Each structure stands twice: as structure tokens, then as C-alpha cells.
């Protein structure tokens, strides 16, 4: 942006008389103080906002200045200097004081063509100079052709006004519609490309007028003029051209040519015989021919008359366009104008509305006898309209022209009223100084202070009060300004009036005080302000309602809290005897009932009909309110005036559920017992959950058994036999002697994942961890489904146990067998009151130990959703408690001093690495516990016990204490489990109903939600929550976690060929779990994404976790009969490059099965599954989904016919959306990103395939490139071919990486940025400086936390900054990256490079018709909620 001189122009120049004015500019004579030289100062009004139409845009001003700076010619005006202030840009120009050329010529008695061409030649010379610089003026007309000095023998022409001038770039097409209709070229009218030729047309028109005094194309209307121009409709009439030479007419004809290419250029015109005669005869013909001076003088006179009228029509045009804008004030509306108003009145009002002071001044100057006090048709004089618009200059002008300061409109309002209505403080000061009356009432009894309050102008109200305006004046409705403020909710106005000393207890005609008005309308801040200034809280209206009654009736909870905190009378009765509690109970508003009861209201007050609040609630059948009133001690035996109890009223209205509750509470002893059950006791929560995670053989079961052993029992405890004696492949005796190969370990955990790219750019492993990552798992050489150990844990083993020296626990041991992982998301990380123990064996090499721990911690972290709002530094409020335990220290001969603890030499480095990665997400104990899992009495085991006991005590201390009802439910659960039989699932609603029906009728749903959460914490039940499972209680976790899933997923011997593909009949499932209701069980498993039912076949069920078939269809066949297009993506984790939890791919397969079954209604969709892969065919396109790169990526490859590119795009988008939905719902804490596969290598079936990462696209985009180099193939591939199969329709509607709006950054990305930028940086390179760079400095003061306050639970300032900044349309990911780099935060910018999406499709609804159902592709046919609801 060009920066002009910011100094005050008045410091350097003395400004004098006005020389002229335009729409947005005024030209004044000025004198330079330092030299005494005279110049013209052109004041151009700047446009305030982009959307505004008032003023000139910055771009247009800078263009005019740049052109003026470039030009220097005797016939063109020159620029001296440029200044700028808040409202204007001031151009200091050469003073052209000779007036217009045409005015000068009109004064002559006669003029030959020869004399005329001398002036015209100067114009042509000036235009020749401009065109040589490729500058087109675009506004050549008589008014812009001036004389430098008319008093010299040969006056010099000056071309002025370069406001429309443009530098023509012949490489870029330029179109616009501008200029004066009489002089514009046809290409402007027709909106065709413009060039220098447009000026030549204007010269032709000027010449025509100069010679004849007539305008060639002028019509009666603007439209007619433009039509004449477009049609080139002109002629040389004898009346005007009788004395005109043939050469002059030829000159004009060659210029007024419609085709710009055939029009004379400036060079041609200078060589034309009329301008430059070729012989004496041509020269003589010019001398003999004369300008038609009679007509020319008439033209000049007519022009001056038009200029007089033009001011009025200009005002009319400007204000009409102004009135159509959306940002006009209330005064600037059509209520001040009418077609029946005089033309002059309209012009005056238009000029006022548009702040056109010069225009109004000219207009009034030409209307010497006009009475400016006369009103328009609506009875509003101009002075009042000007007061409403707030322009003091116009007020001064009107008063100077005779406007009375006390003039009123037909409603009795004066100028103060109008200014107050629109909030013009300076205008009010001006009116007050000029003695305009303040407290004039209009016909409705209102004065200025009323209207200021009604429109929320606190500064105006404050000013009027300071001027002495009476704040207690009432209008015809007896309302004060404070009533108006209270009704409309203007706190600042109410505060100003209260501080001015107004009476806060005046009542209006309805008997309402301002407090009653504000309370009814819910303005708690005004209520608080009024109370602080002495408002009577118990003042009542005509119906006896106090403020609390009205707030309760209108459900204004914040007002109710304010009134109660201020001490209003809570038991006040209205004229019917109803207290606020009566009103709340009748309406059934539970939160208000609770608030009133907590304020110690009387529960048993009777109204005039003898009814207590309990009677009203019972009569209306509001069970929750009845229950709460009874709990709080309301009398159930109270009688109405006609002798009825609350129970009688409920029965008469057939509210049997209410009547039944009241019947059970008749005896006070029963009610007392129920109330006692709900009160907290001194008993602490008896147990919490201990969850153990680790790979098979890490010693989890042994560790639990050892922790259960007491001191005496530990002497007699027999060690569990080591499996290495019988299965050396599973537990090698020495990691050095029997180190497993990569292929063994990876094939067993991720069969079929070995086809990874070997080039460094395609590998997903982190530097330094590659070795360990490739050997993460030491699994049996057989397929993991073939269990080699009958003693190994099946699914999730759950037991209640007392751990000696620690306390009672519900112990949940999660099997290390990957086949069970697909069910862990419902149980692993759903309780922050649990202790999570990650166990690993020291038998493994250090790299494998580290990566096993990373695997499980990534799993736990991924299961925890992001909390909103994001906390300071991205921290979690309740991170999971994690303890790391290393086993087999005895076998590995870890050194241990006599009687001391094992000393593992790598514990510090392992803990440091783990805490660096997961310290913000998990609460990891500071110590790594190294022990022999079988030595229950060892020192190491004792240290672990002590640590677990400390954590347990800490957790239990913050858990709510037990209630008798909770203990009662625990004792009742066994009988409920027995009653439920094969289905141990129950909805929360059913649980609430059963407890209320069988155990305690006074327990509310909120009470029982808390109790259910406590039972969940103890492990008695499990609350299951997800998108498909909401508020479902698993009454017996062992039933599902151990019995059902343990049996179903550990199936060993297939009974049929299709079992290898994981397909089972309903009968097969029934045989696997014979004790369960198979239909309900399948719906449960379906909702958990463990299986997918094929509704088309009716009896088949897909269970991907049980698939044994491997390596089917892992790549496309080479034979292709038709031309195909290829494309694909790889979905990978962004941060920690560990394998996806195996279960996630099973869930992906389940959802893809479900999705393809939804698509296959026409029989053209098919899916084939195998271990870690599947192949889909749908509507002519084929798709592979593969788990690759040792489980660290999910690849989606699509191919289809060249003619079906859009189908391929939609299929890829739908399947990726399905996978991303599964990720988001199952692993909400895992951030993933899409990398793109080389379509050319996919087409050539070339492996390894080049992987394009987001940073590749961003780098290319920065360099303005639209293709990427395939370094493997040595060729380039375009963005469109990589991302959308070369489909230009899709590509054109998409946003690319840098241009994607920053609001698309997901919460996990924002949380990571908060973690990087929230903490104060020593060099200031944190969120504060970023806020300044993004243009939001106000947020720094608002969210700055450097005041020593604890930061743990403060909201993230970076998150707040992004939320604010992304409301602007120009906030793109690319802008954010560049701002971060400018800040010096390359770490944050590089993270964005890794995590940001590079392609966002914005397809319209029509394009997605084929895959409309993909929107909910991750949604199960069933939800557990629907299962248990029956």
C-alpha cells in the first residue's frame, strides 16, 4: 500500500477559496508557505470500508496518484505533492486558473477552423504523450480541458482530472463502465475490452461539439444517449454544419467509428490533413470554414444551465443511492422523502443525507428566496433531518440561511430530540450551545431523554442529564426514561440514569417500576444495577406481582438468582395468594423450583383456593417437581379448601404416576428413610478400577496375582510355569540368542502389511526409532487367531480383588492379543478415576520396549476426546493416571543390591522420552517400576504397592462419598443381573425407573446419573457412550467383556470355507455364544462396530477380526481392456508414528461392509475382505483399502474408466469420509492426515509408489506451480491428476492447501498449536505477538494470563485467537503459516505443514446424488440404545 505524507497539510499550505467540487472531491486554491507559489489542492474523500459506496477507494486514489506522478507534459496537469489524513487524500496540483476552453471560446465573436485546430492540436499533443505511456484518460470532455492562463496571447491547454485514467496492460483484458454518457465510446457502453481507442472517440465528440455547438449523441434521457452511442447514431445536419469543411467532417467520421481497431489512432489524427494540411488548398479550406459560433454560444449557455440543475440532480442521485445502502442511519430513510415533495425539497434532503455540504451550499446559494424552515410532506423541516444526520457543518449552514433553532416537526419533536434519537453527542453540544430547548415534549409526552434511552445511547443520556434534563419526566404512559432503558435492555443507559440520580421506583400506568419491567424481560444486569441504587425489590404491580413473580413466570433464571441474592421476599403472595413457588410448580420449571427451595422459601403456603405448590404440581402431573418438593419436606397431607390432598388431585386428573408416588410417601417414616438414603454418608468409595495393558506374555496376569498376595501367602505361592519351555518361539530364552526377524513380528501382528515403500520419503517411521518400530511385537509364528496358550487372557478379564497393602479394586486386564482390540474403545479410557498400568517385558530389546509403551499410550491418548474450550497449553482437565511397569527383571539379570530395588540403566531415558511425548495428555508417574512380576513379597513390589495406594487414596478423596442408596443398588445388582438373563444391557432411563419403582421414589434422574457414574467408577457397571451407544448401562461387565467377546473373538477352528473370510451365519454366532439371545447380541456387536450384518443376505454376518484369508487382491490386475484412471491416498497419524491400534482397521472393514450393503440395492456393489485389506466394486469403479507400512497407514486406491472420473472422485471421497468418521468416533484424540499416491505409478502397477505429503503441495503452491515431481519416475504429475483423477469439474470447485480457510483446522490441530504458542516465550514469540501480527491486538489484553493466576484451567488464548480470526473470510491456512514464520515459530508452521489438509472438495448437492447415503456411512444399522429400549 502506498504511503502518502502524513503531516498536516495546513502546516505547509494556506488553503483559500473553493475552485470546484465533484462527487467525492473538492478543489481549493492554496499557497505553499515556504515558496509563496500557488497550487490547487484536491481533497479526495476516502472510502471508509470496502462495502461503503461513499468516497473513493484506496486503490482508485493510488492509481490516480501513480499516473499523475508519471506524467510531465506542457498540455497535461502536473502533480506537486500528496498528503493524507484520516478522511481525505490531498493532491497538491498545478494551478490551472484559466477556466474551461469552451467558456473561453464562447466569448469570441468568430472562430475559424484554423484557429480551432490550434487548440485541438494541443489536446492531441497531450493525448499523444499519454498514449505513448500506455495511459488512457477515459474521461475526456469539455469540462476537463482547461486553460493555464486565458490572459496570454496564445493560451496553453491543460488536460485535467485523471480519476478514471488507467495504465493499459495489453496482456490483460480490461473492462469497465464509467465516464460521461455523451462522451463515452461504444465499447464502454457494451462492456467490451477497453484501450487507448476510447479516448479517440471522445476527441471526435469534442470536435463535433466545438465545430457545431451540438452534441452528436445527446438524447432526452441517459438511456437514449447510450443507445445512440452504441448504434453510432449521428449525422452532420446542415443547420449546424453548413460552414464546416469536408476535411473537418472526415476527421470526425474517422474518429466516430464503432470498431476500435478501425478508429484513427492518436498518431493518425495528428497526421490528418485537417490538423496538418498537405497542401495550400487544404490550408485555405480551413481558413475559409468557420465554427458555428451562434450554436456554439447556445451550447455553452445550455451547459451552464445544466450545471446549475446538475447540482440538484446530483444530490438526488447521490442520496438515492445512499438511501439504498444497508448501513444508513434511521434518519436516512424514506420517511423523510416523498414523491409529492418539491424537487428543491428533495434535493435539500438528499444533500443533507449524503453530508454534501458543498452541494447544499451551492444549492441554497442559488435559492435566494427559499424558506428553509418549511417542512417536507411528512412535517419534518430540514434542520431536524440534519440534526438526525449529525452533520454540524450542515446545521451551521441551515442556521446561517435562516433555520430556526427551536423548529419542531408535526409530532412536536425538536432538533435535540432528533439528535438524541441517533446518538449524536457533538451535535447535541452544538444545539445546546445555540440554546435549543432540552426538555421539549412531543405529542406522546416523550422528550429527548426518553428517545435516547429507547435507542440505547448512554453517552447521550449522560450528556442530557449533565445539561440539566429532568430524568424523572413521565410520558403519557407515565413511563420515565429509566422504564424505556429497562424495557429495551440497555444497561449502560440505565446505569447512567441511576448515577444521574433518577427516581428508580416511579411506577407507570400499569403499576410497574423499572425493576418489574427489567425482571420480566430478563435483563439481570439492569436488575442488579437498580437494586444497588435502592430499587424496592418487593414493589408490586396492579396484580400484586413483585419482580420475582414476573421473572419466575417468564423463566428468567439469571434474574431470579440476582433477586434472591439481593434479598427479595421469596414468599410474597400476589392477589390470588400465589407465591413465586406456586408459579414455578404450576409451570413445572425444575431449575427454578430448586433455586427457590434453596432460598428457603416456605413450601406449604396456600393460595386463596387452599392449594399449596405441591397441589399445583400434582394437579398438572409434573412428577419431577412433586418428587423434589416431597424430598424437601413439603406436606403430602395438606388439604385444599374443598378438602383434597395432592394425591386426590393427581388421581382426578389421571396422573397415576404422581398419585402412586404420593401414596408411597404418606407415612413419614417411609419418606424419612428415602430422604436419608440420598444424603451423603461418611463412607468413601469402596473401590476404583485398575486397568492393565501390555503385549501378550508381558506378565499382566502374574502381576495381578502377585499384588493380591499377602505376606504369608507369598511364601507358599507357586510361580506360574514359564511358557518358554514349551513355546520357545513365543518367549525366546535370550533376546540375543533368539532374536525374532522383522518379518515374523510384523507378519503376525499385521499380516500383509509388508508391501511398504522403501524410499525414505515414503517411510512413516521416525528417525532413531525405525529399528524398534519394525520389531515392536514378538508374536507367535502362527496367525494370532490360533491361540498357542490356553492360559492367556481372553478379551478383558474382570475381577474384584483386594490388592494387599493397596486396597479394593475392580481389576480389568486387557488381553494383548490383537484380535480383541476392536472392542477396547468402549472400556479402555472411559474413566478418569481409574489407574492405567502399562506392562512391558525387559526380555525385549530397548527399542521394542519403548515402542510397546508408545503403542499403548498412543492408544490411550487417542481414545480421549478433545475438550472444548481448549485449556491453556492444550492440557486436559482430568488426564488419565498411568503407571509404567517393567517385568522379567529377574530373567534379564537386572542388577539389584542386596535387599534393594532393581536398577534398570535405561529407565531415565525411557521415562524422559515417554513424558516428552505424552506429558500433556496423560498423567504419567515419575517412576518406572522395574520388578519380577512373580515376586509378590519383593521390595520392588512393595514400592509399587505403595505408589498404587497413594494414587488410589488421591482418587478416592476427590470421588463423591457413598450414599445409602448407592450401597443399596450395589446389593440389588446381582438380582437384576439374574432377571436380565442373556442381555445385561439396560438404558439409563430404565435404570432410573427401576430404582424409583423398587428402591427409592424420591431419587431424581440427576441423583441416579451421579450414582450410575459412581457405580461405573467402582466397576460394578459400565456406562457405554458413543455416537451409536448413548446412556447405556452394562449391568455385568464380565458378561460382555469376558464371556461374550472372549468366546466370540477367540474362535479357533473354522467350520466352513467362508469363515476364513470372517463371514458367519446367525446360527454360527449362536453356537459360539449359546447362552445369549443372538439377535439382541448381534445388534449390540453391530452398534459397537465389531460386526456388520448383511441385510441383503439376511443371515450372514461379517466379523473382520476373525478373518483368516490373507493376500487376496492386494493389487490391481495388469490386464486392462479399457483406459482407466487411478488415484489414491494414504491416511497416517500426524504426530507419533506408531501403528494404528489393530482394532481400528477391523472397524473400518465393518463400516465399509455396512456402507457397501447400503449402496448395493441395485446389485452392482460388492466387497471382499481379507486380513488387513478389502476390495470394493461400486458403479463401475473399483477400490482397495489396505493397512500398510506395518500398520502405520491406511491406503485407499481407486480406479475406474476414463469416462467416470467424477464417480471415482465421489467414491474416493465417500470411502475416505467413512474411514475418517470411524477414526473420529473411535479414536477422537488421534490426529490423521491424508498423503496422496502417485496415479502414474498406480496405473503402471509400479511398487513402491511415490507418496506426496502436504508439505510437497504447499511448497509447490508457494512457487505458483500446479504439479509435483515424481522423483522415483522422473516425471511431473499435475495436482488435478493426483487429487481428483484429472477431473477438472471437481478440481475447479475445490480449495487447495494454502487457500483452505483456517476455520477448517480441526480441534486436535488447534490444541497442538495451543500447546506450542500458549506458554510465554522469552523472546515474545508466542500467541500475543501472533495476535498483533494478525491484526487483533484487543485480544492480547483480554486473554493475557501473565498475572500469576494458575494456568491449568484457563482457556487457551491461542484457541480464542483462532476462533476470532477465522471469522474473517481472508483467514486462510497459508496466511496463518506465513504469519507463524514471520513470528519465528517454524515449529508451529512446520506442524501445520504436516497436519493441514491440501484438498477440500466443495461439490454441490447434484454432484453427490450418487453417494448421498455416504453422509452417515459410519453409522450402525443398530444402536445399543435401541436394543435395550425394548
Swiss-Prot record:
Q: What is the effect of changing residue 308 to D?
A: Reduced Ca(2+)-calmodulin binding and Ca(2+)-calmodulin-independent kinase activity. Decreases apoptotic activity
Q: How is it modified after translation?
A: Ubiquitinated by the BCR(KLHL20) E3 ubiquitin ligase complex, leading to its degradation by the proteasome.
Instruction: Give the EC number.
Output: 2.7.11.1
Q: Provide the alphabetized UniProt keywords.
A: ANK repeat, Apoptosis, ATP-binding, Calmodulin-binding, Cytoplasm, Cytoskeleton, GTP-binding, Kinase, Nucleotide-binding, Phosphoprotein, Repeat, Serine/threonine-protein kinase, Transferase, Translation regulation, Ubl conjugation
Name any one Pfam family assigned in the record.
Ank_2
Induction and repression of expression: Up-regulated following treatment with IFNG/IFN-gamma.
Q: What is the effect of changing residue 289 to A?
A: Loss of phosphorylation and significant increase in proapoptotic activity
Residues annotated as domain Protein kinase:
13-275
Start and end residues of each Roc domain = 681-955
Kindly state which reaction or reactions the protein catalyses.
L-seryl-[protein] + ATP = O-phospho-L-seryl-[protein] + ADP + H(+); L-threonyl-[protein] + ATP = O-phospho-L-threonyl-[protein] + ADP + H(+)
Q: Where along the sequence do coiled-coil regions lie?
A: none
Disulfide bridge partners, by residue number? none
Q: Where is the active site?
A: 139
**What domain of life does the native source organism fall in?**
Eukaryota
Residue ranges of the region described as Calmodulin-binding:
267-334
Which top EC class is given?
A: transferase
Question: Changing residue 42 to A: reported impact?
Answer: Loss of activity, apoptotic function and of autophosphorylation
The Gene Ontology biological process annotation of the record reads: apoptotic process; apoptotic signaling pathway; cellular response to hydroperoxide; cellular response to type II interferon; defense response to tumor cell; extrinsic apoptotic signaling pathway via death domain receptors; intracellular signal transduction; negative regulation of apoptotic process
Please list the residue ranges covered by the ANK repeats. Answer: 378-407, 411-440, 444-473, 477-506, 510-539, 543-572, 576-605, 609-638, 875-904, 1162-1196
> Which residue stretches belong to region Autoinhibitory domain?
292-301
Q: Which InterPro entries match?
A: Ankyrin_rpt, Ankyrin_rpt-contain_sf, DAPK1_cat, DEATH-like_dom_sf, Death_dom, Kinase-like_dom_sf, P-loop_NTPase, Prot_kinase_dom
Its biological purpose is as follows: Calcium/calmodulin-dependent serine/threonine kinase involved in multiple cellular signaling pathways that trigger cell survival, apoptosis, and autophagy. Regulates both type I apoptotic and type II autophagic cell deaths signal, depending on the cellular setting. The former is caspase-dependent, while the latter is caspase-independent and is characterized by the accumulation of autophagic vesicles. Phosphorylates PIN1 resulting in inhibition of its catalytic activity, nuclear localization, and cellular function. Phosphorylates TPM1, enhancing stress fiber formation in endothelial cells. Isoform 2 cannot induce apoptosis but can induce membrane blebbing.
Which PANTHER family does the UniProt record give?
DEATH-ASSOCIATED PROTEIN KINASE 1, SERINE/THREONINE-PROTEIN KINASE 17
Q: What is written about domains in the entry's comments?
A: The autoinhibitory domain sterically blocks the substrate peptide-binding site by making both hydrophobic and electrostatic contacts with the kinase core.
The identity of this protein, by name, is Death-associated protein kinase 1
Amino acid at each position: 500500500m502506498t504511503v502518502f505524507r502524513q503531516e498536516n497539510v495546513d502546516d505547509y499550505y494556506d488553503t483559500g477559496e473553493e475552485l470546484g467540487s465533484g462527487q467525492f472531491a473538492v478543489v481549493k486554491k492554496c499557497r505553499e508557505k515556504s515558496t509563496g507559489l500557488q497550487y490547487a489542492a484536491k481533497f479526495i474523500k476516502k472510502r471508509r470500508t470496502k462495502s461503503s459506496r461513499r468516497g473513493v477507494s484506496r486503490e482508485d486514489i493510488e492509481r490516480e496518484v501513480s499516473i499523475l506522478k508519471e506524467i510531465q507534459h506542457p498540455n497535461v496537469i502536473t502533480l506537486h505533492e500528496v498528503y493524507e489524513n484520516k478522511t481525505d487524500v490531498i493532491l497538491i496540483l498545478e494551478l490551472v486558473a484559466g477556466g474551461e476552453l469552451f467558456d473561453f471560446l464562447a466569448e469570441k465573436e468568430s472562430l475559424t477552423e484554423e484557429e480551432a485546430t490550434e487548440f485541438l492540436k494541443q489536446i492531441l499533443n497531450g493525448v499523444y504523450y499519454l498514449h505513448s505511456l500506455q495511459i488512457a484518460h477515459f474521461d475526456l470532455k469539455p469540462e476537463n480541458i482547461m486553460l493555464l492562463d486565458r490572459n496570454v496571447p496564445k493560451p496553453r491547454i491543460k488536460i485535467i482530472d485523471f480519476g478514471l485514467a488507467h495504465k493499459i496492460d495489453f496482456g490483460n483484458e480490461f473492462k469497465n463502465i464509467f465516464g460521461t454518457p455523451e462522451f463515452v465510446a461504444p465499447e464502454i457502453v457494451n462492456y467490451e475490452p477497453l484501450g487507448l481507442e476510447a479516448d479517440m472517440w471522445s476527441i471526435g465528440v469534442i470536435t463535433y461539439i466545438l465545430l457545431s455547438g451540438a452534441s452528436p449523441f445527446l438524447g432526452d434521457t441517459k438511456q437514449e444517449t447510450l443507445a445512440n452511442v452504441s448504434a453510432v447514431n449521428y449525422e452532420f445536419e446542415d443547420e449546424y454544419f453548413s460552414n464546416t469543411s469536408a476535411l473537418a467532417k472526415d476527421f470526425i467520421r474517422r474518429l466516430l467509428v464503432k470498431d476500435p481497431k478501425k478508429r484513427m489512432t492518436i498518431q493518425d489524427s495528428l497526421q490528418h490533413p485537417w490538423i496538418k494540411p498537405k497542401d495550400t488548398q487544404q490550408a485555405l479550406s480551413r481558413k475559409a470554414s468557420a465554427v458555428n459560433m451562434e450554436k456554439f454560444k447556445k451550447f455553452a449557455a445550455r451547459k451552464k444551465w445544466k450545471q446549475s440543475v446538475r447540482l440538484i440532480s446530483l444530490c438526488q442521485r447521490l442520496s438515492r443511492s445512499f438511501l439504498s445502502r444497508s448501513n444508513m442511519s434511521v434518519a436516512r430513510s424514506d420517511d423523510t422523502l416523498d414523491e409529492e415533495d418539491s424537487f428543491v425539497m428533495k434535493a435539500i434532503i438528499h444533500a443533507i443525507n449524503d453530508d454534501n455540504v458543498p452541494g447544499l451550499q451551492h444549492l441554497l446559494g442559488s435559492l435566494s428566496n427559499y424558506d428553509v424552515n418549511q417542512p417536507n410532506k411528512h412535517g419534518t423541516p430540514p434542520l431536524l433531518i440534519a440534526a438526525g444526520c449529525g452533520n454540524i457543518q450542515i446545521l451551521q449552514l441551515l442556521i446561517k440561511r435562516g433555520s430556526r433553532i427551536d423548529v419542531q416537526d408535526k409530532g412536536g419533536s425538536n432538533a435535540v430530540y432528533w439528535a438524541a434519537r441517533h446518538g449524536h453527542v457533538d451535535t447535541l453540544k452544538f444545539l445546546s450551545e445555540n440554546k435549543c430547548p432540552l426538555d421539549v415534549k412531543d405529542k406522546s409526552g416523550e422528550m429527548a431523554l426518553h428517545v435516547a434511552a429507547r435507542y440505547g445511547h448512554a453517552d447521550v443520556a449522560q450528556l442530557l442529564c449533565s445539561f440539566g434534563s429532568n430524568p424523572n419526566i413521565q410520558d403519557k404512559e407515565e413511563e420515565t426514561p429509566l422504564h424505556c432503558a429497562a424495557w429495551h435492555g440497555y444497561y449502560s443507559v440505565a446505569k447512567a440514569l441511576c448515577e444521574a440520580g433518577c427516581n428508580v421506583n416511579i411506577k407507570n400506568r400499569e403499576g410497574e417500576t423499572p425493576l418489574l419491567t427489567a425482571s420480566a424481560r430478563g435483563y439481570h444486569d439492569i436488575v442488579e444495577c437498580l437494586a444497588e441504587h435502592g430499587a424496592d425489590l418487593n414493589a408490586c404491580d396492579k396484580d400484586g406481582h413483585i419482580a420475582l413473580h414476573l421473572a419466575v413466570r417468564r423463566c428468567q433464571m439469571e434474574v431470579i438468582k440476582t433477586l434472591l441474592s439481593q434479598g427479595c421476599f421469596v414468599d410474597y403472595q400476589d392477589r390470588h395468594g400465589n407465591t413465586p413457588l406456586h408459579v414455578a410448580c404450576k409451570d413445572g420449571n425444575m431449575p427454578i423450583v430448586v433455586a427457590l427451595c434453596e432460598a428457603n422459601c416456605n413450601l406449604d403456603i396456600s393460595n386463596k383456593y387452599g392449594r399449596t405448590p405441591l397441589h399445583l404440581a400434582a394437579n398438572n402431573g409434573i412428577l419431577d417437581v412433586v418428587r423434589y418438593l416431597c424430598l424437601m419436606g413439603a406436606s403430602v397431607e395438606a388439604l385444599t379448601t374443598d378438602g383434597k390432598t395432592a394425591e386426590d388431585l393427581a388421581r382426578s386428573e389421571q396422573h397415576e404416576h404422581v398419585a402412586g408416588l404420593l401414596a408411597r410417601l404418606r407415612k413419614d417414616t417411609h419418606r424419612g428413610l428415602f430422604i436419608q438414603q440420598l444424603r451423603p454418608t461418611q463412607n468413601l468409595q469402596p473401590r476404583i478400577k485398575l486397568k492393565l495393558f501390555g503385549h501378550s506374555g508381558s506378565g499382566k496376569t502374574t502381576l495381578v496375582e502377585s499384588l493380591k498376595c499377602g505376606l504369608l501367602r507369598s511364601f507358599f505361592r507357586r510361580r506360574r510355569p514359564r511358557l518358554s519351555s514349551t513355546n520357545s518361539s513365543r518367549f525366546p530364552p535370550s533376546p540375543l540368542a533368539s532374536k525374532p526377524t522383522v518379518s515374523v513380528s510384523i507378519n503376525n501382528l499385521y499380516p500383509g502389511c509388508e508391501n511398504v515403500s522403501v524410499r525414505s520419503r515414503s517411510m512413516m517411521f521416525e528417525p532413531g526409532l525405525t529399528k524398534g518400530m519394525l520389531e515392536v511385537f514378538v508374536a507367535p509364528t502362527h496367525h494370532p487367531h490360533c491361540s498357542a496358550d490356553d492360559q492367556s487372557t481372553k478379551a478383558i478379564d474382570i475381577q474384584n480383588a483386594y490388592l494387599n497393602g493397596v486396597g479394593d479394586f475392580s481389576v480389568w486386564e486387557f488381553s494383548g492379543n490383537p484380535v480383541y482390540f476392536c472392542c477396547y474403545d468402549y472400556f479402555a479410557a472411559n474413566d478418569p478415576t481409574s489407574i492405567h498400568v502399562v506392562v512391558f517385558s525387559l526380555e525385549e530389546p530397548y527399542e521394542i520396549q519403548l515402542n510397546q509403551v508408545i503403542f499403548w499410550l498412543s492408544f490411550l491418548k487417542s481414545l480421549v476426546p478433545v475438550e472444548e474450550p481448549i485449556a491453556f497449553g492444550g492440557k486436559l482437565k482430568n488426564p488419565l493416571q498411568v503407571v509404567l511397569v517393567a517385568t522379567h527383571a529377574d530373567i534379564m539379570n537386572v542388577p539389584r543390591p542386596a535387599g534393594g530395588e532393581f536398577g534398570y540403566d535405561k529407565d531415565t531415558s525411557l521415562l524422559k522420552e515417554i513424558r516428552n511425548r505424552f506429558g500433556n495428555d496423560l498423567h504419567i508417574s515419575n517412576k518406572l517400576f522395574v520388578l519380577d512380576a512373580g515376586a509378590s513379597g519383593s521390595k520392588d513390589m512393595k514400592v509399587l504397592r505403595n505408589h498404587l495406594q497413594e494414587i488410589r487414596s488421591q482418587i478416592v478423596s476427590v470421588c463423591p462419598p457413598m450414599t445409602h442408596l448407592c450401597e443399596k443398588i450395589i446389593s440389588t445388582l446381582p438380582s437384576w443381573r439374574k432377571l436380565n438373563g442373556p442381555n445385561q444391557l439396560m438404558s439409563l432411563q430404565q435404570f432410573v425407573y427401576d430404582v424409583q419403582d423398587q428402591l427409592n421414589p424420591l431419587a431424581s434422574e440427576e441423583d441416579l446419573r451421579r450414582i450410575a457414574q459412581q457405580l461405573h467408577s467402582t466397576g460394578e457397571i459400565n456406562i457405554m457412550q458413543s455416537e451409536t451407544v448413548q446412556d447405556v448401562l452394562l449391568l455385568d461387565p464380565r458378561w460382555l467383556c469376558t464371556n461374550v467377546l472372549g468366546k466370540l473373538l477367540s474362535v479357533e477352528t473354522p467350520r466352513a470355507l467362508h469363515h476364513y473370510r470372517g463371514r458367519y451365519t446367525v446360527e454360527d454366532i449362536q453356537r459360539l455364544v449359546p447362552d445369549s439371545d443372538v439377535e439382541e447380541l448381534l445388534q449390540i456387536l453391530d452398534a459397537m462396530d465389531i460386526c456388520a450384518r448383511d441385510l441383503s443376505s439376511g443371515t450372514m454376518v461379517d466379523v473382520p477380526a476373525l478373518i483368516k484369508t490373507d493376500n487376496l487382491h492386494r493389487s490391481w490386475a495388469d490386464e486392462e481392456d479399457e483406459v482407466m484412471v487411478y488415484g489414491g491416498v494414504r491416511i497416517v497419524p500426524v504426530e507419533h508414528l506408531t501403528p494404528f491400534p489393530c482394532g481400528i482397521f477391523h472397524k473400518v472393514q465393518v463400516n465399509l461392509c455396512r456402507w457397501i450393503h447400503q449402496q448395493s440395492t441395485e446389485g452392482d456393489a460388492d466387497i471382499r475382505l481379507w486380513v488387513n485389506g478389502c476390495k470394493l466394486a461400486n458403479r463401475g469403479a473399483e477400490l482397495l483399502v489396505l493397512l500398510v507400512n506395518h500398520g502405520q497407514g491406511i491406503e485407499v486406491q481407486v480406479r475406474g474408466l476414463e469416462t467416470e472420473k467424477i464417480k471415482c472422485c465421489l467414491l474416493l471421497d465417500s470411502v475416505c469420509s467413512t474411514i475418517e468418521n470411524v477414526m473420529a468416533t473411535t479414536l477422537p484424540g488421534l490426529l490423521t492426515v491424508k498423503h496422496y499416491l502417485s496415479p502414474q505409478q498406480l496405473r503402471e502397477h509400479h511398487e513402491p509408489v511415490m507418496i506426496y505429503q502436504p508439505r510437497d503441495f504447499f511448497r509447490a503452491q508457494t512457487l505458483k506451480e500446479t504439479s509435483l515431481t515424481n522423483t522415483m519416475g522422473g516425471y511431473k504429475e499435475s495436482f488435478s491428476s493426483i487429487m481428483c483423477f484429472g477431473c477438472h469439474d471437481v478440481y475447479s470447485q475445490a480449495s487447495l492447501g494454502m487457500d483452505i480457510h483456517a476455520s477448517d483446522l480441526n480441534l486436535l490441530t488447534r490444541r497442538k498449536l495451543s500447546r506450542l504458542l500458549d506458554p510465554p516465550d522469552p523472546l515474545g514469540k508466542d500467541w500475543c505477538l501472533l495476535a498483533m501480527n494478525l491484526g487483533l491486538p484487543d485480544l492480547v489484553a483480554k486473554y493475557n494470563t501473565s498475572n500469576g493466576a494458575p494456568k491449568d484451567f484457563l482457556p487457551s488464548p491461542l484457541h480464542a485467537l483462532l476462533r476470532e480470526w477465522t471469522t474473517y473470510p481472508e483467514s486462510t491456512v497459508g496466511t496463518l503459516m506465513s504469519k507463524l514464520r514471520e513470528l519465528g515459530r517454524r515449529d508451529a508452521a512446520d506442524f501445520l505443514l504436516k497436519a493441514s489438509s491440501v484438498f477440500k472438495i466443495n461439490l454441490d448437492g447434484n454432484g453427490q446424488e450418487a453417494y448421498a447415503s455416504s453422509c452417515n456411512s459410519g453409522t450402525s444399522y443398530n444402536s445399543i440404545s435401541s436394543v435395550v429400549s425394548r
